[in-house]
UniProtKB/Swiss-Prot annotation:
<feature type="binding site">
    <location>
        <position position="310"/>
    </location>
    <ligand>
        <name>Mg(2+)</name>
    </ligand>
</feature>
<dbReference type="InterPro" id="IPR000941">
    <property type="entry name" value="Enolase"/>
</dbReference>
<keyword id="KW-0964">Secreted</keyword>
<dbReference type="GO" id="GO:0006096">
    <property type="term" value="P:glycolytic process"/>
</dbReference>
<feature type="binding site">
    <location>
        <position position="283"/>
    </location>
    <ligand>
        <name>Mg(2+)</name>
    </ligand>
</feature>
<feature type="binding site">
    <location>
        <position position="335"/>
    </location>
    <ligand>
        <name>(2R)-2-phosphoglycerate</name>
    </ligand>
</feature>
<dbReference type="GO" id="GO:0004634">
    <property type="term" value="F:phosphopyruvate hydratase activity"/>
</dbReference>
<dbReference type="Pfam" id="PF00113">
    <property type="entry name" value="Enolase_C"/>
</dbReference>
<dbReference type="GO" id="GO:0000015">
    <property type="term" value="C:phosphopyruvate hydratase complex"/>
</dbReference>
<keyword id="KW-0479">Metal-binding</keyword>
<protein>
    <recommendedName>
        <fullName>Enolase</fullName>
        <ecNumber>4.2.1.11</ecNumber>
    </recommendedName>
</protein>
<feature type="binding site">
    <location>
        <position position="241"/>
    </location>
    <ligand>
        <name>Mg(2+)</name>
    </ligand>
</feature>
<keyword id="KW-0456">Lyase</keyword>
<feature type="active site" description="Proton donor">
    <location>
        <position position="204"/>
    </location>
</feature>
<keyword id="KW-0324">Glycolysis</keyword>
<dbReference type="GO" id="GO:0000287">
    <property type="term" value="F:magnesium ion binding"/>
</dbReference>
<feature type="binding site">
    <location>
        <position position="386"/>
    </location>
    <ligand>
        <name>(2R)-2-phosphoglycerate</name>
    </ligand>
</feature>
Length: 429
């Protein structure tokens, strides 16, 4: 039985130069593990609370309070517990915090410990993390949803949609999918240069040109796909993260592309996109609390495209259950730091899958070199992962880990491909 012997924590920097929490954990059998916590730019109102220091240090974004919460509160509570009882440990963390949003200890402190425990337990058992968490049947490699053009809160441009993604659904393996995505990424750079547009990068490694709007961006990416030698819709298809909460004002509506629009008008816009482009997924097309709009949108186009709830669900089983009951969205975006423990994350994924919802594993805009989400995507069989462009080491680290997992699985590995979008990919062919 691997017993937790030591727990340490420190403040490190994420990919945006902001502080975040790193936790180290040692077991009595000599096993050591480390986990680092990501942070988002466009954060949902209902996410678990990150504990930040305030004051002048790091512009108020320091995490010394969260580090001390690990050292002073969490460590004494979990030392002596068995690392292979993840659910019991995570429940102890929740009980210790005692708040519904993890605001006392901080979700960043709690998650760091939760993830470090799972990694230590896997190492102690002599298993890769994906196998330890997913069991003997974990073998599906996810489609990389590569954010190659950044807008919204991830870029300083006039483009309202936050992420324009390519999905190499026609590739025969994850290794080839990664190559296809990288080739499209470089092709897009050439397309942008030829048109005199900026090739500067946004938070997640995608290009951040100041283009006219959504359709102009999709046209650029479509051209890049074809210029790279791939067939649009069959080999490589398109996806969006609109992050609509960022431009929604209660009582006013959606301030989108220089117009104020209702949820119904946004729905009409998305329907027009589906008529013109091979889109398989739209994330956060409406605001996080626009339940009626979400239900109506899902009724109208939910049979044509994957509608992913990010800010809507915040990886929270309770909000997801409400969405399922209402008929809002048909897929869940999975971000471990939105909910704050591994157990709650796994519960949300299980609820989604058992209810016929797809899942997409996701990074945050403020990332680290930690690769846990790559293993987690394979462990739960998400079939989709969103972890940025094939550029910047904090993004590529996850893709490279998936390459290693595919090699480890050998002949047992299966790339999700268009089966990740069983109802929608067929319409693109």
């Amino acid at each position: 039985m691997p017993i937790i012997e030591q727990v340490g924590a420190r403040e490190i920097l994420d990919s945006r130069g902001n502080p975040t929490v790193e936790v180290e954990l040692a077991l009595t059998d000599g096993t050591f593990a480390r986990a680092a916590v990501p942070s988002g730019a466009s954060t949902g109102e209902h996410e678990a609370v990150e504990l930040r220091d305030g004051g002048s240090r790091y512009g108020g974004k320091g995490v010394d309070k969260a580090v001390q919460a690990v050292l002073d509160d969490i460590a004494p509570a979990v030392i002596g517990m068995s690392a292979d009882d993840q659910r019991l440990i995570d429940q102890a963390l929740l009980d210790l915090d005692g708040t519904p949003d993890k605001s006392r200890l901080g979700a960043n402190a709690i998650l760091g410990v939760s993830l470090a425990v799972s990694k230590a337990a896997a190492e102690s058992a002599g298993l890769p993390l994906f196998r330890y968490l997913g069991g003997p049947n974990a073998h599906i490699l996810p489609v990389p949803m590569m954010n190659i053009l950044n807008g919204g809160a991830h870029a300083d441009t006039g483009v309202d949609v936050q992420e324009f993604m390519v999905a190499p659904i026609g590739a025969p393996s994850f290794k080839e999918a990664l190559r296809w995505g990288a080739e499209v990424y470089h092709s897009l750079k050439s397309v942008l240069k030829k048109q005199g547009l900026s090739t500067g990068l946004g938070d997640e490694g995608g290009f951040a040109p100041d283009v006219a709007g959504t359709k102009a961006a999709l046209d650029l990416i479509s051209s890049a796909i074809e210029a790279a030698g791939f067939k649009l819709g069959t080999d490589v298809t398109l996806a969006l993260d609109v992050a609509a909460t960022e431009f929604y004002t209660e009582g006013t509506g959606y301030s989108f592309e220089k117009e104020t629009r209702t949820a119904e008008q946004m729905a009409e816009f998305y329907a027009s996109l589906l008529d013109a482009y091979p889109l398989v997924s739209i994330e956060d097309p409406l605001s996080e609390d626009d339940w009626d709009g979400w239900v109506s949108l899902t009724t109208q186009i939910g049979d044509r495209v994957q509608l992913v709830g990010d800010d809507l669900f915040v990886t929270n089983p309770e909000r997801l259950e409400e969405g399922i009951e209402r008929g809002a969205a048909n897929a869940l975006l999975v971000k471990v730091n939105q909910i704050g423990t591994l157990t709650e994350t796994l519960d949300a994924v299980a609820l989604a899958h058992n209810s016929g919802y797809r899942t997409m594993m996701s990074h945050r805009s403020g990332e680290t070199e930690d690769t846990t989400i790559a293993d987690l995507a394979v462990a739960v069989g998400s079939g989709q992962i969103k972890t940025g462009a094939p550029a910047r080491s904090e993004r590529v680290a996850k893709y490279n880990q998936l390459l290693r997992i595919e090699e480890t699985l050998g002949d047992a590995a299966r790339y999700a491909g268009d089966l990740a979008f069983p109802r929608f990919a067929l319409e693109t062919k």
